[in-house]
């Protein structure tokens, strides 16, 4: 590992803004990844392994993907941080629902960032809005301060904000390295026109990373039509339980769901997306 990357973590040597610039370069160069980067949203250790083996450049680790993702357990974060050859970002979101957080929730999110840093993550994924649908700059600055020199992605809270153009400038001003967005549409493919505008407006000041509904059938097209250089997917398929005894008719919270079938990131799906975007 070169001294530049080592110095990335030395707060006594560089200030936070400079550290985040190094984080941005580190994302691109640390594992000699091609310029087009693939981030996989993973909800378990097995999914993170599948992302690694499938050739993903980075994982966004979270739980509760069915509700858009929430902060994963510290145990899961620590386990995934032991994996070599892939960068690990952690979602900081205390619950599903909107992105207007109470003071107590805000403190939880700040504490979660500190815990993630101590666990050894490479970056965090954050966001927060005001009641009027704008970026909550005061709160998000606190999250950025807690993140220190970590790489920071602003998540899809952006997709439900009031003014996309203004919000992008605010996110850049915060010092975020990356914006995960569907272009304020249900899927990234449907949001291509707005994604194009965001890439043009960003003009290299921040990475625009399309996400939502991304698969091997459309990843390359989304990248080509938007000019984006990174893309985000969950790459999931059905995982069938190995339980021999099954007690039917009892659910654990998911309505009309079979508790013996769930979604996991699939190595072959990750690999298919990766091959399409090379």
Question: Language-model segments: which ranges?
Answer:
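Catalytic cores of alpha/beta
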Residues: 46-49, 101-112, 162-174, 214-229, ...
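Alpha-helix-loop-beta-strand connector modules within alpha/beta enzyme cores
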Residues: 69-96, 137-156, 193-215, 260-278
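Hydrophobic faces of well-ordered beta-strands that scaffold small-molecule active sites
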Residues: 36-40, 59-61, 88-92, 124-126, ...
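Glycine-enriched alpha-helix->loop->beta-strand junction motifs that scaffold or abut catalytic
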Residues: 54-59, 84-86, 120-123, 146-150, ...
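Active-site-adjacent beta->alpha loops and helix N-cap segments on the catalytic face
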Residues: 46, 66-85, 129-147, 161-166, ...
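Glycine-rich phosphate-binding active-site loops on the catalytic face of alpha/beta enzymes
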Residues: 60-69, 115, 119-131, 176-189, ...
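Active-site mouth loops of central-metabolism enzymes
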Residues: 35-43, 92-108, 153-163
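Glycine/small-residue-rich loop that forms an oxyanion/phosphate-binding "nest" at active or ligand-binding sites
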Residues: 75, 80-81, 86-140
């Amino acid at each position: 590992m070169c001294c530049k990357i080592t110095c990335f973590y030395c707060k006594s040597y560089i200030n936070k803004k400079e550290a985040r610039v190094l984080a941005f370069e580190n994302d691109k160069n640390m594992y000699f990844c091609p310029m087009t980067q693939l981030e996989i949203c993973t909800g378990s250790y097995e999914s993170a392994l599948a992302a690694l083996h499938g050739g993903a450049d980075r994982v966004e680790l979270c739980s509760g993907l069915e509700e858009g993702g929430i902060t994963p357990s510290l145990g899961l974060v620590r386990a995934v941080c032991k994996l070599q050859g892939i960068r690990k970002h952690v979602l900081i979101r205390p619950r599903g629902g909107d992105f207007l957080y109470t003071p107590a929730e805000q403190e939880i999110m700040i504490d979660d960032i500190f815990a993630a840093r101590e666990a050894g993550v490479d970056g965090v994924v954050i966001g927060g809005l005001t009641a009027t649908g704008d970026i909550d700059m005061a709160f998000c600055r606190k999250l950025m301060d807690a993140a220190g020199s970590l790489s920071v992605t602003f998540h899809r809270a952006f997709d439900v904000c009031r003014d996309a153009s203004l919000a992008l400038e605010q996110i850049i001003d915060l010092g975020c390295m990356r914006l995960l967005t569907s272009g304020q549409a249900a899927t990234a493919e449907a949001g291509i026109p707005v994604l194009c505008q965001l890439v043009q407006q960003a003009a290299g000041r921040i990475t625009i990373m399309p996400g939502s509904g991304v698969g091997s059938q459309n990843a390359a097209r989304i990248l080509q039509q938007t000019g984006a250089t990174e893309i985000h997917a969950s790459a999931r398929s059905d995982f069938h339980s190995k339980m021999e005894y099954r007690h039917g008719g009892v659910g654990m919270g998911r309505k009309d769901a079979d508790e013996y079938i769930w979604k996991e990131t699939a190595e072959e799906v990750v690999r298919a997306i990766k091959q399409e975007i090379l």
